[in-house]
Curated annotation (Swiss-Prot):
Species this chain originates from: Thermoplasma acidophilum (strain ATCC 25905 / DSM 1728 / JCM 9062 / NBRC 15155 / AMRC-C165)
Name of the protein in its database record: Chaperone protein DnaK
Gene name of this polypeptide: dnaK
Domain of life, source organism: Archaea
Presence of keyword NAD: no
Compositional bias (Low complexity): 580-600
GO molecular function, one term: ATP-dependent protein folding chaperone
Chain segments carrying region Disordered: 578-613
Pfam family name, one: HSP70
Length: 613
């Protein structure tokens, strides 16, 4: 039986693994161990003679061929961005597919058999479009993508597969090349369930590399008066040296940085030769590492947990190999991290375990992911009405009944948005469609059932059905938006920043909606009442409705509230009078019927009865 391999398609590095005889094994790259261990750099390059290079060979020639080299393509997944290389253009899916093709080839060489099925991981914050783009990349590479799963979830599988004896609250600290993801999960009875996610899209190993680069460049500038950061070739060499030093200082106390012929001046060639200690590295990266507290606190808040309630701490990503990073996070949470898994390999191993679960090779594990942002429909006044809240476990299917806003309305527009803001316009539009053929009826009568269905890959399907006619329309949310992980973080920050402003805006819209409903209700009551309401009262209430509608149009909330209170009170009084009148008429009619049915001649007739002996 063919294997399902697990793939960590990373921004900086990629890796793959497979379960053999019940044990996860990392698939070695054909080039052997690189600076990233068994993982290989997510680089794709095209030479001027038309050759394509992937992985370490592409990275090695980047200095000499910068215009033909592409890296960090993952950041553009789910967008319509095109990478321009010489006279050709490539989509992010194509570049990712080249990386996946290399993985496929390496896996087939390692296993000695065709490999066609895969589980691919994505960041927890990836939206529907980015997940779909990742799946498309797998298809382009020749894979049948069986599942798209979140990277922190995969890591938890890697650490937890042999430790399913009791219930756990797990915090996954995933610090990669460019981003930090903090995920809190609940584990029990073989089920992993994501409780919350948080992160920082501008915090990662590259920030640490940049701090080292600046230290070296500042030192050189002080001595030579030259800023090497302005020379692209010199900068790339500095960056590579900084990354190498950072990795070496995870296991040693000092390392030498030797960069001969870094630049040339009128006085001749210049060189860099210096020693960097672990203590100096820790001093340089300390301000960067301190920023992890915010995302950790947010994740704890989202999961409604205290630091003391976390029972397992899992590290993922190359920078978590740095002793200072590990100690800082462990001290902040007051718990030692789990060992036994290389943080650089954890995600690929977890994906491989999920592949084995799907194949039935590993049993008694169930994987439950969550949707990172709230999914809503736009309703009257531009309000985003939530259907599926953020951090809802997927797969999930939820429905809600809506109605029409106008009399005899035969078409409704379903506008799907994603985000945490109360108003639709402040969120990201995922798509829209029209449901036509609704049976004409007064507003508020038709019943439109809107259903959001998210599958196990996080792909969203939306349908709308008119309950009366059975008319149905739907949409699958694919690449219709350019929402990135950065935008998700921005949206969450904006949601906090503008919370009070949003609350007031939403309250105003709801007030105006309620006012319009009251005006409509009063008009309908007066029309239905006919001559049961005297002419003078009708005119007075009609004028009040006109005044209210004018205030609604002017969006004068204070005036709207005053007029609503008066109109509500007046219509209630009219309603009470109509009820009393109807009640009096009913009693009068009942008495009349009683008198008429008593006797036709007005005499009382005694019934005869015989006593039973």
């Amino acid at each position: 039986m063919s294997k399902i391999i697990g793939i960590d398609l990373g921004t900086s590095n990629s890796a793959a693994a497979v379960v053999i005889s019940g044990k996860p094994t990392v698939i070695p790259s054909s080039e052997g161990v690189s600076i990233g261990g068994k993982a290989f750099p997510s680089y794709v390059a095209f030479t001027k003679d038309g050759q394509m290079l992937v992985g370490e060979p592409a990275r090695r020639q980047a200095l000499l061929n910068p215009e033909g080299t592409i890296f960090a393509a993952k950041r553009k997944m789910g967008t319509d961005y095109k990478f321009k290389v010489f006279d050709k253009e490539f989509t992010p899916q194509q570049i990712s597919a080249f990386i996946l093709q290399k993985i496929k080839k390496d896996a087939e060489a390692f296993l000695g058999e065709p490999v066609n099925e895969a589980v691919i991981t994505v960041p927890a914050y990836f939206n529907d479009n980015q997940r779909q783009a990742t799946k498309d990349a797998g298809t382009i590479a020749g894979f049948d993508v069986k599942r798209i799963i979140n990277e922190p979830t995969a890591a938890a599988l890697a650490y937890g597969v042999d430790k399913s004896g009791k219930s756990e609250k797990i915090l996954v600290f995933d610090l990669g090349g460019g981003t930090l993801d903090v995920t809190i999960m609940d584990f029990g009875d073989g089920v992993f369930q994501v409780l919350s996610t948080s992160g920082d899209t501008r915090l990662g190993g590259t920030d640490m590399d940049e701090a080292i680069v600046n230290y070296i460049a500042d030192d050189f500038q002080k001595k030579e008066g030259i800023d090497l950061r302005k020379d692209r070739s010199a900068y790339i060499r500095l960056r590579d040296a900084a990354e190498k030093a950072k990795i070496e200082l995870s296991t040693t106390l000092s390392t030498d940085i030797d960069l001969p012929y870094i630049t040339v001046t009128n006085s001749g060639p210049k060189h860099i030769k210096m020693t960097l200690t672990r203590a100096k590295l820790e001093e340089l990266i300390s301000p960067i590492v301190e920023r992890v507290k915010g995302p950790i606190d947010k994740a704890l808040e989202g999961a409604k947990l205290k630091k003391t309630e976390i029972t397992k701490l899992l590290f993922v990503g190359g920078p978590t190999r740095i002793p200072y990073v590990r100690k800082y996070v462990e001290d902040y949470l007051g718990i030692k991290a789990e060992g036994g898994v290389d943080p650089m390999e954890a995600v690929a191993i977890g994906a491989a375990i999920q592949g084995a679960v799907l194949k039935g090779e590993i049993k008694d594990i169930v994987l439950l992911d969550v949707t990172p942002l709230t999914l809503s429909v736009e309703t009257l006044g531009g309000i985003a009405t939530p259907i599926i809240p953020a951090n809802t476990t997927i797969p999930v299917r939820k429905s809600q009944i809506f109605t029409t806003a106008e009399d005899m309305q035969t078409t409704v527009t379903i506008h799907v948005v994603q985000g945490e803001r109360p108003l639709a316009k402040d969120n990201v539009s995922l798509g829209m469609f029209n449901l036509t053929g609704i049976a004409p009826a007064p507003r508020g009568v038709p019943q439109i059932e809107v259903t959001f269905d998210i599958d196990s890959n996080g792909i969203l399907n939306v349908t709308a059905v008119d309950k009366a006619t059975g008319k149905k329309q739907g949409i699958t949310i694919t690449a219709s938006t350019k929402l990135s992980k950065e935008e998700i973080e921005r949206m969450k920050k904006e949601a906090e920043q503008y919370a009070e402003q949003d609350r007031k805006a939403k309250e105003q819209i709801e007030l105006l909606n309620n006012a319009e409903s009251l005006a409509y209700s009063v008009e309908k009551t007066l029309n239905d009442a006919g001559d049961k309401v005297d002419k003078e009262t009708k005119e007075r209430l009609t004028n009040e409705v006109k005044d209210l509608r004018k205030a609604i149009e002017e969006k004068n909330t204070e005036n709207v509230k005053t007029l609503m209170d008066k109109l509500s009170k007046d219509i209630q009084e009219v309603g009470a009078k109509m009820y009393q009148q109807a009640s009096a008429n009913t009693q009068q009619s009942a008495q009349s019927n009683s008198q008429n049915s008593g006797s036709s001649d007005g005499k009382t007739v005694d019934a005869e009865y015989k006593e039973k002996s």
